[in-house]
A protein has these predicted regions:
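C-terminal catalytic "cap/lid" subdomain
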Residues: 1-186
């Protein structure tokens, strides 16, 4: 907020790490440092669990386009990670992240793609039960709805039955205990 109010040309965030890594260093200890990343790419990585800086903390800096430099107080010579409005995509993927704790509702219906409002019907069942969806990959006759396990709770079977009833599907099934893996980049 201060960086924006003072029209700063750069905001430095000093922390205990040298910036963002291409993947979780607890899983891949030799993960390379990301030298430059966009605000949007940062938000994707933060959503998936990267915790160097909270994605909402950058909002005041996005509109004026103030770059953020994540630096390490224990290694001040390290250049860290620059978070910028846009970047040249030297490498298309800048990071890979994962989050566990998801379920997938798998829906199959012949000619689903020709039925106006089909996805809306399925999503309305979730909305009526207070459940957000995280992701929704689709095919011609299939749709998968990814939801958080904690939001689904013990209502999985009831949700499956409601979708079957409302959408008149060939089949609906539920897969629990899944993780989302995201590649982030341009």
């Amino acid at each position: 907020v201060v960086a924006r109010a003072t029209d700063s040309f750069l905001y430095e965030n000093w922390t205990d790490v040298s910036g963002f890594r291409m993947t979780d260093p607890r899983i891949v200890p030799e993960a390379r440092l990301i030298e430059e990343i966009t605000y949007s790419e940062l938000r994707e990585l933060a959503y998936m669990g990267a915790s160097v800086v909270h994605d909402e903390a950058i909002f005041p800096l996005i509109e004026p386009g103030i770059p953020i430099n994540i630096r390490n107080t224990h290694d001040p010579e390290n250049k860290g990670t620059m978070i910028v409005p846009d970047r040249e995509a030297v490498h298309p993927v800048c990071g890979i992240a994962a989050r566990s704790g998801f379920s997938m509702i798998n829906i199959e219906k012949t000619l689903m793609n020709r039925e106006l409002g089909f996805a809306l019907k399925a999503l309305t069942v979730l909305k009526d039960n207070g459940i957000n969806f995280e992701h929704m990959p689709t095919g011609i006759d299939t749709m998968s709805i990814i939801v958080k396990d904690e939001e689904l709770g013990t209502r999985g079977d009831a949700i499956v039955e409601s979708i079957k009833e409302v959408c008149h599907t060939n089949s609906v099934s539920l897969s629990r205990g899944l993780a989302l893996i995201a590649t982030v980049g341009k």
